[in-house]
């Protein structure tokens, strides 16, 4: 726990996982939060979330990660689902091109229902399915660079890059928050566990510039 002058204050960052149905959102979350994978998991009904703790610069950070169904019939939860989010993982399945083509729609929805400064990562999931790949790494990187997103390919099945992807988003949120006047009473209130964080940046240049990572890399 932190021993700084804020008395080990904890911060809560709400992160949402979005993307088409069956791209592996729930398994990404369960792999990160519980190190579990269910090959026969059914489509998420409604909304669920998991909380994961990290320590960054001596401060306890809680990431509350929300998962919801991608099917159109569940879109009624949209506003509440996005409210207060400061980070988002936009997920597609590298073996299903249609899910990649839907990324633009999900980004538009994210922009509509959340602050434009949300830390965002494009995630090409199921990179273990290399033999039936339908979206190249280069295409994923190019889209991420165009939209100003981090990019990473993951596999919830074998854990490739899952922890790295989530923690990169969490650290980016923390970095953005740290740029602000954390000693001000306003930000202490916003960032306390009693309130959901609202992320505001000083400028329009997001630090979430395109990052390219291949799940097949050795690093």
Swiss-Prot record:
Lipidation (S-geranylgeranyl cysteine): 215-216
Subcellular location: Cell membrane
Any GO MF annotation of the entry: GTPase activity
Short sequence motif named Effector region, residue ranges: 41-49
Membrane topology: Lipid-anchor
Positions annotated to bind GTP: 19-26, 67-71, 125-128, 155-156
InterPro entries associated with the record: P-loop_NTPase, Rab_GTPases_membrane_traffic, Small_GTP-bd, Small_GTPase
GO cellular component terms given for this protein: peroxisome; plasma membrane
Modified residue annotations for N-acetylserine: 2
Keyword terms: Acetylation, Cell membrane, GTP-binding, Lipoprotein, Membrane, Nucleotide-binding, Prenylation, Protein transport, Transport
Protein's GO biological process: protein transport
Gene3D superfamilies: P-loop containing nucleotide triphosphate hydrolases
TM ranges: none
Function of the molecule: Intracellular vesicle trafficking and protein transport.
PANTHER family found in the cross-reference section: DRAB11-RELATED
Family, as annotated: Belongs to the small GTPase superfamily. Rab family.
Protein name according to UniProt: Ras-related protein RABA5d
Organism: Arabidopsis thaliana
